[in-house]
A protein has these predicted regions:
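Conserved ATP-binding subdomain of kinase catalytic cores across diverse folds
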Residues: 2-160
């Protein structure tokens, strides 16, 4: 089923008459469809030792958790979770009528060239930017409650 959803999301006509081009970023766990100023992320239906997106419900929960967690640091990017639906005649739509067949994270895109990796590649990562970023990360983590039952360093060793 995901193959037909990926085909649908890869088609500019799926987003309306004004969309001419879609860029697609594929990772080991997701497909991200860049559409104008929007981005839609589809979690791959898979199960790995460290995550489980194998069912529709697993993917819905993962999308909701991603939005909830990432809105804390990027509320201007994370819009929400949208269903991919299939009408009785089999037509797919984003947030349309019919049965929900998958879930998407809807995001506002940020400007091209603003990835930290691109700053590094272009030798534009200044000391002040790195220090500001480190301070933001420190402040963020300082304000979070510790997860005392998560397994600590032993759990991290199992992941890494």
């Amino acid at each position: 089923m995901q193959a037909s959803i990926i085909e649908f999301l890869s088609d500019p006509k799926s987003y309306g008459p004004d969309v001419e081009k879609i860029d697609i970023i594929t990772t080991h766990i997701s497909h991200v469809f860049l559409v104008g100023r929007k981005a839609y992320k589809l979690k791959r239906a898979l199960k790995l030792p460290y995550l489980d997106f194998s069912t529709l419900e697993d993917r819905r929960k993962a999308c909701e958790n991603e939005v909830k967690l990432n809105r804390r640091t990027a509320p201007m990017i994370y819009v929400g979770v949208e269903p991919v639906t299939s009408s009785p005649d089999g037509q797919l739509a984003i947030d349309g009528e019919g049965e929900t067949v998958d879930w998407l994270v809807e995001m506002n895109r940020f400007e091209d060239g603003l990835l930290l990796s691109e700053y590094v590649q272009k030798n534009k990562l200044s000391n002040s930017l790195a220090e500001n970023l480190a301070e933001e990360i420190f402040n963020f983590h300082s304000n979070e409650n510790p997860m005392l039952n998560a397994g600590g360093a032993g759990a991290m060793a199992g992941i890494v």
